[in-house]
Amino acid sequence: MYHPKALIIALLFTLSLILAAKSAEQLQIGVKYVPEECPVKSRKGDRLSMHYTGTLAKDGSKFDSSLDRNRPFEFTLGAGQVIKGWDQGLLDMCISEKRKLTIPSHLAYGERGHPPVIPPQSTLVFEVELLGIKNRHVDEL
């Protein structure tokens, strides 16, 4: 004989597993700091200057950091110059804003990884700070 409470508990447990799996597949954007004034936000086509530190989600080991080189990283947002998780996760950022991006493997380096530093199927975590937007005219900033 089935007990309604046991059935409900089993359904809730199954639902929680499904939701946990879904969240692991999606880009997670955590806003760590936003300046009080934000006259301009990043958009596709912008040339961004960033500081970042990248770690593996599974063990927290650092694989890269612009801070270690004391040299910001520059790229064009939305141009495919970086992993998809960055192109998506850095949209609508303010200058000086800091974010934590948790990027599932399919939006990072996928099944191949980036040997020898990033294993296949790795979820990546990036602490990022937008230092500047290089290509905007003064009146747009």
Swiss-Prot record:
Checking Pfam families in the record gives: FKBP_C
Under Gene Ontology molecular function, one entry of this record is: peptidyl-prolyl cis-trans isomerase activity
Which protein, by its recorded name, is this?
FK506-binding protein 2
* Regulation affecting activity: Inhibited by both FK506 and rapamycin.
Where primarily located? endoplasmic reticulum
Q: What does this protein do?
A: PPIases accelerate the folding of proteins. It catalyzes the cis-trans isomerization of proline imidic peptide bonds in oligopeptides.
Q: Where in the cell is it found?
A: Endoplasmic reticulum
Name the SUPFAM superfamilies for this protein. Answer: FKBP-like (SSF54534)
Which Enzyme Commission number(s) are listed? 5.2.1.8
Source organism (scientific name): Cryptococcus neoformans var. neoformans serotype D (strain B-3501A)
Q: What is the lineage of its organism?
A: Eukaryota, Fungi, Dikarya, Basidiomycota, Agaricomycotina
**Record's family?**
Belongs to the FKBP-type PPIase family. FKBP2 subfamily.
Task: Give the UniProt entry's GO cellular component terms.
Answer: endoplasmic reticulum
Q: Which keywords are on file for this protein? A: Endoplasmic reticulum, Isomerase, Rotamase, Signal
Q: Which GO terms describe its biological process?
A: chaperone-mediated protein folding
